Amino acid sequence: MLQIKTEKEELDCGDDQNPKESSAVPLTDGASPEPQPQILQIKIKEEEPDYEYYLPTIKREMDPVPGAASPLAESEILQIKIKEEEPDSEDDGNSAATSAVTFRDWDNCWSDEENWDDSRPQLNQYNSDFPGSADTANTPAINTVLSRGNGLFVVNQEKRVATNSSCQSDTGHVDCSVGSEPSGFICCKCGDSFAHHSDLHTHLYACAGHNITSSFTNASEEGQHSHKNGGVLPREKPFKCTVCGKCFTLKNSLQLHHRIHTGEKPFTCTECGKSFAQSCSLQLHSRTHTGYNPYVCTECGKRFSSNSGLRRHMRTHTGVKPYACKECGKFFSDLSTLHRHQNSHKGEKPFICTECGKGFTLKDSLHRHQRTHTGEKPFICSQCGKSYSQSSNLIKHQMIHTGVKPFSCSECGKCFAVKDGLRNHQRVHMRRNYSAAQNVAEFSL
């Protein structure tokens, strides 16, 4: 709580003046003396009353300079001295912090705060009785209110005391971190307190629309409250999809979700004409044309255009299958594979071919099937010019040119370029083993 006392005294012309506390206004020769702006000397003292909390008391003394009897002009110069001291103290006050600040006029002394960027918290409300106020010893505690966006940041002066040198940081944010109490920014909705205004700004999103009545008196209680809520308070999702009922926190996320239902794909590839619903998907797709594959597998050296593609590939080496089907308990390494499997339980085939009426669970499967009707083969081998309707068939064909045979037989060690070739080869071993087992059975009889 700031207590402000203002006292006016007239200086004696015969007393010695401190050069830092007074100034003389020269007059030009031959010109009549014009009314000069009055120079005021203001002394602000912060004192500590005798009760539990440290509440500074500010005394203000305005001393007019001799020879300046004209009324105050708009360009008046104020010299402010801020001095902190404790009442009833036996010290001589040499240890008190003192600083001098010079302003053009009182109306413009808050110009720095008024010119702050909107993204920074601005001083929205302060003690209106501060300039030239009377004794405010009996006034209630002052809560400085800072605004940022639609939220309010309340700085409780009873818990956090701001000195004259720390009221504003170098970045323009109001810093009231002086004091022993860790909680200084209080949510106006639920009463929760935070040490930094950025933490409160994040909390306001979580607190919106929820009747939260928790309050903290220290940092440990705040940490326990955060731990009980999983570290993050529930966030409001006011934007609801009218088609499927899914909710989102941001309106932009809802608009992107609507494209799933409408089929809108505004982002088109200039190379192949393929369209995408999001720009990030188009950027990843463009790497297939440029050949930019920055993500490399440390096991086999295979390269990928996205980090997610590399993570999915790494599961083939580790054997991790984190996605389980709730119907049959079967595990899958990829989420899209699980979705395709779940459609087999549902029996849903929403994508129907207009040529033959065949249904498919995925839209991509329908596109691949339609190429059998149109005869389109967009995937062309760069070595021999042979074309294919599916990219997987092109990859299998390119292994003939590269000589790569990653699939080996566990019985004889023979290698194959494609997995289907290995399966056909393994049937030979199965027939031989079956014939040998029959011969052994006949011989035993």
Swiss-Prot record:
GO cellular-component term (any): nucleus
Zinc finger (C2H2-type): 185-210, 239-261, 267-289, 295-317, 323-345, 351-373, 379-401, 407-429
Keywords (A to Z) from UniProt: Metal-binding, Phosphoprotein, Repeat, RNA-binding, Zinc, Zinc-finger
Positions of the UniProt region annotated as Disordered: 1-38
Modification Phosphoserine occurs at: S89
MF annotations from Gene Ontology: DNA-binding transcription activator activity, RNA polymerase II-specific; RNA binding; RNA polymerase II cis-regulatory region sequence-specific DNA binding; zinc ion binding
Any one GO biological process: regulation of transcription by RNA polymerase II
A Pfam short name: zf-C2H2
SUPFAM superfamilies: beta-beta-alpha zinc fingers
Family annotation (PROSITE patterns): ZINC_FINGER_C2H2_1, ZINC_FINGER_C2H2_2
Described purpose of this protein according to its UniProt entry: Binds to RNA homomers.
PANTHER family reported in the protein's UniProt record: ZINC FINGER PROTEIN, ZINC FINGER PROTEIN 672-RELATED
Protein name, entry field: Gastrula zinc finger protein 5-1
Protein species of origin: Xenopus laevis
